[in-house]
A protein has these predicted regions:
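Short, hinge-like loop/turn segments at secondary-structure boundaries
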Residues: 62-65, 108, 133-137, 223-226
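Structural motif
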Residues: 43-46, 86-89, 114-118, 162, ...
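Active-site-proximal loop->helix
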Residues: 102-107, 127-141
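Flexible, low-complexity linker and terminal segments
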Residues: 1-4, 8, 13-14, 199-251
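Thiamine diphosphate
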Residues: 1-126, 189, 193, 200
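Glycine-rich beta-alpha junction loops
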Residues: 50-52, 122-124, 180, 208-216
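Conserved thiamine diphosphate
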Residues: 133-200
Length: 251
């Protein structure tokens, strides 16, 4: 009998703690499948964030380290520079990467550190109960913006891919989503490419994954996916924002 689907070897047997309908499980699987297919499980080191994915070290069957809040890119930089033959990735949410960790993210990209960053953007602080994040949309209701995000007082959401793509340093900056089958497949390709770039020594790769948070958005999983399509993706368009290798090939 042909096997059409199975759990990736790069995932452990530990049950995921995420809320019902949370896409973190899908994204974990895509990362693990990329690790499996590239044959790098034995030399991969992951860096877990502070946030909903804080226990990622329980789920990935590779060496993992826990970073201080927002400091995953700096931690990954240290690991990669000390152990350049290892494949190093971070897995971070918007409350970690785009707020307290913004400096580490920007400067790792500017230096073109040869690391891979998986950035999950669900426009809210999930672990702490649904506060406004740097990526929360204008007018979005959260625990700390009960009348909706007012850009006059709170500023505009930060578009990480657009910002990082203006830097000279990074190799690959892309935004994907996991709200339907087509987007999941494309997300897998992007994540695998980000790891492949590191294997080839090309430098900094960041894959932003537009995700959902049904619990803190106050929606059913189905409604949350619909909201990703109707509200999140118009503000955070999927696509490749920088790919230096592709640009060179076109020339």
């Amino acid at each position: 009998m042909a096997v059409v689907f199975q759990k990736p070897k790069a995932l452990t047997d530990v049950p995921l703690h995420y809320c019902p309908g949370c896409p973190h499980g899908i994204i974990h699987r895509l990362v693990a499948e990329a690790i499996d297919e590239l044959g790098i499980e034995g030399k991969t080191i992951g860096v877990a964030p502070v946030g909903c994915a804080v226990m990622a070290y329980d789920y990935f069957a590779c060496d993992m380290i826990e970073a201080a809040h927002g400091r995953a890119p700096a931690t990954a930089t240290g690991i990669k520079r000390c152990r350049p033959d290892n494949i190093v990735f971070t897995y971070q949410g918007d409350g970690d990467l785009a707020s307290i960790g913004m400096a580490e993210t920007v400067h790792a990209a500017a230096r073109n550190e040869n690391i891979t960053i998986i950035f999950v953007n669900n426009a809210i602080y999930g672990m702490t109960g649904g506060q406004m994040a740097p990526t929360s949309l204008p007018g979005q209701v959260t625990q700390t913006s009960p009348y909706g995000r007012d850009v006059k007082h709170c500023g505009w959401p930060i578009k990480v891919c657009e910002m990082l793509s203006t830097l000279e340093g990074p190799e690959y900056i892309t935004r994907v989503a996991v709200n339907n089958v087509k987007n999941v497949k494309n997300a897998k390709k992007a994540i695998k490419k980000a790891f492949q770039n590191q294997i080839e020594g090309k430098g900094f790769s960041l894959v932003e994954v537009v995700s959902a948070c049904p619990t803190n958005w106050g929606m059913t999983p189905q409604k949350a996916l619909e909201w990703v399509e109707s509200d999140m993706l118009p503000y955070y368009p999927i696509g490749v924002y920088k790919d230096r290798s592709a640009a060179k090939e076109e020339k």
